Amino acid sequence: MDGSNPFTVLGNNGLTLKDMTQGYATLANQGNKPTLHIVAQVQTANGTDLYNAPTSAEQTFEANNANLVTKALTGVVQRGTATEARATGHTIAGKSGTANDSNAASFIGYTPSMLTSVAMWYPDANGNP
């Protein structure tokens, strides 16, 4: 999302799952925008590190603001549209999403140590999401 499209403000310009993951990872990291990694660490069975992704982060907004958003998103999981995420037994901040015509559903949520994002689409007759 580059902000050059005026429809972005209105919510009409689609975000990729990567965009959403980056934004929520920044919230989970108290306003520090981290470098995203599909695999952060690989260890042997005895705990020897084989790979550690390089880490870096850029402070993009104040930690207090990120914490306020996290508190609101925790309410979504506790009392809102994402209550099934409570089954993990952990405090989770997150948001569910659906399309108006019920052809897509998504959830993105985080704890202080993990973020998960899922998006599913029901394809049309041509196989397009």
Task: Please give the residue ranges for each predicted region.
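Primarily short, surface-exposed interaction patches in extracytoplasmic proteins
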Residues: 1-19
